[in-house]
Amino acid sequence: PVPVWHPGENDREAAALAVATEILAGGRSALLNREIVDKQRKAFAAAAGYDPFSMGTDLWFAYGMLGPKQTPEAFEKALWATIDGLRDKGPDAAQLAAAKRRMIADEVFAQDSLYIRAKQIGSLEVVGIGADRRDDWLQALGSVTGKDVQKVLKQWIVPARSITGLLQPEVKS
């Protein structure tokens, strides 16, 4: 498990986990897609996720969808190498700025939809954060540094804390 956001207590930690996830998996040009899918061809899709707005703790997860000649072992090795690279070097300034800009823009543009606004308000209220703290989250995202990203990856996203699973389709004879 990884920590979720508790306003005023762990703003930077939760926001840094969210930004790290965005750098790794936020769209086609994200690190996992660029490195594992496009460059190394260890999977035909790769992604990661984290929800900072949960009760208690949450899970940080990553996954890949493999083709016939792609192995789980090769994917997992490439996944950890990509995460290790971000953890060791940190994001470059452009990566960090782009990730934060996308996340903040997504939050702002989500306000154009009554459905999404209601969903966000309800979610924040249900988990005990309170909808009035939404702008605090945007400020927390904006304050994340490259060192913050490295710190949370070193603390939370490490092989010793991971569990690997393999889902395979049922083979019918």
Please describe what each predicted stretch is.
Residues 24, 28, 70, 87, ...:
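Short coil/turn residues that cap or connect secondary-structure elements
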Residues 20-21, 33, 80, 150, ...:
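Generic solvent-exposed, charged/amphipathic alpha-helical segments
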Residues 1-7, 33-143, 161-169:
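M16 family metallopeptidases and their MPP-like homologs
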Residues 145-173:
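In a subset of proteins, long, contiguous C-terminal domains/tails are tracked
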Residues 1-31, 53:
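His/Glu-based metal-binding/catalytic segments typifying zinc-dependent metallopeptidases
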